[in-house]
């Protein structure tokens, strides 16, 4: 309902956006947990392949055990929001790849999909997190996924300026 109030045509037609009230059709999709995905891929690359601090088997064991017994690895990687060019570029690549994938098909109402990084009033990141196991970026089983392009809580260790530099790199 809140979205319908903000969209031109819905009030005039007394219809929600889900029932054809919008004057202009657009379809969008949001990547809930995008930063969790990017940070997780960054950690796998950093610890398993580049620095060889752990094996993939050990990392999988840490995830199965919700990080218990593996605290030395948890939350010590390269994460989005710290002005880390590698991780920031990984986010850009994921955005481009996911956008290209979504646009292989047209929305039912025509046009093309608009990509969004889920910024809003919706709490999907919480409910999806409740159903998601531990992730390689240090997130525990059941914790909320990241909402939008914010850094995982506690991972933006270099302050606001570094977070803004990371966000400014995004396309």
Can you say where each PLM-predicted feature lies in the sequence?
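Acidic, glycine-enriched catalytic cores built around paired aspartates
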Residues: 1-171
């Amino acid at each position: 309902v809140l979205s319908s109030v903000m969209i031109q045509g819905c009030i005039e037609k007394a219809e929600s956006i889900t029932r054809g009230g919008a004057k202009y059709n657009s379809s969008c999709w949001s990547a809930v947990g995008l930063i969790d995905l990017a940070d997780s891929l960054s950690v796998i690359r950093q610890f398993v392949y580049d620095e060889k601090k752990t094996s993939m088997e050990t990392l999988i064991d840490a995830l199965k055990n919700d990080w218990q017994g593996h605290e030395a690895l948890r939350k010590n990687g390269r994460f989005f929001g710290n002005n880390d060019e590698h991780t920031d570029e990984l986010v850009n690549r994921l955005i481009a790849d996911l956008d290209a994938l979504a646009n292989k098909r047209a929305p039912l109402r025509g046009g093309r999909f608009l990509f969004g990084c889920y910024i809003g009033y919706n709490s999907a990141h919480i409910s999806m997190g409740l159903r998601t196991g531990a992730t390689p970026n240090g997130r525990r089983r059941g914790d909320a996924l990241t909402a939008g392009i914010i850094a995982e809580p506690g991972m933006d260790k270099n302050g606001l300026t570094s977070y803004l530099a990371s966000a400014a790199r995004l396309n």
